[in-house]
Amino acid sequence: MSVYKDESEFDAPWENISSAWLRRYPNPYSSHVVSADVLERYIDEKGRLHTERLLVKQGRVPRWASELLNVSKSYILERSIIDANKRELLSETFNIDHLKLLKAMEYNRYQPSQEDSSKTSITTLAQFASPLRLGLGRRVQKYCLKRFPEQLIGSRRGILYVLQKYKSFS
């Protein structure tokens, strides 16, 4: 298994970032996201908002992987919990197909910065595990690990894009 961890900060309050996070699709930095459909949404007894979405992504695959896969779409399950009382957004995202090639999992935690509550801290943990043998699994994991930081930057730019879009309406 390959692991990537990142800690970063948004120069915006948690309330704005969590709202933009829920509305982040579509945006110009996520053209690979074909659709984002809410499967379930509810508020639990503690007042936390739970959301489960199905994302359909279409992206490029390396040539050596395209021979293993016959499709270019991937189905992703995204679960999130927004706790306005604790000012915390937790999310987990993982693929539900192509599991014979790769299991990709991403976990995020958004909360106000401890140094400056007008900013939002984000902690990201990504894990990539491939069951393939003969060195192919390591190759798949290495490819994902190499591309993930670039994808993370695009994801965060998308949130900022949505944040700016909504600011222009106010």
Question: Where on the chain are the PLM-derived regions?
Answer:
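Hydrophobic ligand-binding cavity/cleft-lining segments
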Residues: 1-61
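Terminal "cap-and-tail" regions of soluble proteins that handle hydrophobic small molecules
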Residues: 2-7, 64-72, 83-170
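Generic detector of isolated residues embedded in canonical secondary-structure elements
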Residues: 15-16, 79, 123
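Short edge beta-strand segments in beta-sheet-rich domains
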Residues: 33, 75-77, 105
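Glycine-rich portal/gate segments that line the openings of hydrophobic small-molecule binding cavities
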Residues: 39-93
